[in-house]
């Protein structure tokens, strides 16, 4: 379950950002998850709660935005938006795609008091 390691990394970033900005308690966190990141949303919520235990983010509300992946088509030389690994280019139908974005997880923003 790689969700736990992703959430531990996100919790580290949240702690660092809260400290830098003088936030004593984080109330909300927004994560962007790429469509190809291979994470289970319910597992992400569960692991996030564990990763944030005993931190400034304990008990915060987690918001998850799934963003489409971007790929480069080798056959028609165009960018394409895809939502799954076995995607085809919407422009030419080719399966020869190189993922350029959307297989990661990032902390988009946070709110606190």
Curated annotation (Swiss-Prot):
Gene3D superfamilies cross-referenced by the UniProt entry: 3.30.2320.80
Protein function: Involved in the maturation of [NiFe] hydrogenases. Required for nickel insertion into the metal center of the hydrogenase.
GO molecular function (one): zinc ion binding
GO BP term (any one): protein maturation
Residues reported in the UniProt entry to bind Zn(2+): 73, 76, 89, 92
Sequence positions that bind Ni(2+): 2-3
UniProt KW Metal-binding keyword: yes
Protein family per UniProt: Belongs to the HypA/HybF family. HybF subfamily.
Keywords assigned: Metal-binding, Nickel, Zinc
The name this protein goes by in its record: Hydrogenase maturation factor HybF
Membrane-spanning intervals of the chain: none
């Amino acid at each position: 379950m790689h969700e736990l390691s992703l959430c531990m990394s996100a919790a580290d970033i949240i702690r660092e950002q809260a400290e830098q900005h003088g936030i004593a308690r984080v109330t909300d966190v927004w994560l962007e998850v790429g469509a190809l990141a291979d994470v289970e949303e319910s597992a992400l919520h569960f692991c996030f709660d564990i990763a944030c235990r005993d931190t400034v983010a304990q008990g915060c509300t987690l918001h998850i935005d799934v963003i489409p992946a971007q790929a480069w088509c080798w056959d028609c030389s165009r960018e394409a938006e895809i939502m799954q690994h076995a995607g085809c280019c919407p422009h030419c139908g080719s399966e020869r795609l190189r993922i350029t974005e959307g297989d990661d997880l990032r902390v988009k923003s946070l709110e606190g008091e």
